[in-house]
Amino acid sequence: MGTPEQNKALVRRFIECLDSGDVAGAAACFDAERYYSHAHRADLAGTWEQMKGRRRANPFSESSYERLALVADGDRVVQHVRVSSTHTGTFLGVPATGRRVSVDQLEIWRIENDKIVEHWGGLVEMARLYDELDRGDSR
């Protein structure tokens, strides 16, 4: 098992690869045979397919991410990030508003043998997001 700092470095590397479009580099961060995403209810192949589909049909654009915290304890790494995007398509029944919205999101990864083997994520402040879309409330 890696140290908490090594585990955080692995998650940072995965996110950097994903953000830069380096799919092979991102995939190398996972144990493809053992990985399971609780958020996607899928193995690694299923998770990638769901992510591609969501990107194609994404009702938000011009997204930016601000990492507020990256914490490791044992084999778990937790990231708290603020996502800001422009609402450009229908989401939760709310037509595109053109508003800039921001919500906090949590991601949790479990690391084993220097690879990501489990993920819980996309834990978003949905009530806050809906309020921003529906009424234009913002931070």
Where are these regions (language model features)?
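Low-complexity, intrinsically disordered terminal/linker segments enriched in charged
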Residues: 117-139
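Short, positively charged
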Residues: 1-2, 82-91, 139
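Exposed beta-sheet edge and beta->alpha loop/turn motif
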Residues: 84-113
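Residue-level signal for nonpolar/aromatic packing positions in well-ordered secondary structure
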Residues: 11, 26-27, 79, 109, ...
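C-terminal-biased regions
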Residues: 60-64, 111, 116
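A solvent-exposed, acidic/Ser-Thr-rich amphipathic alpha-helical stretch
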Residues: 23-77, 81-85
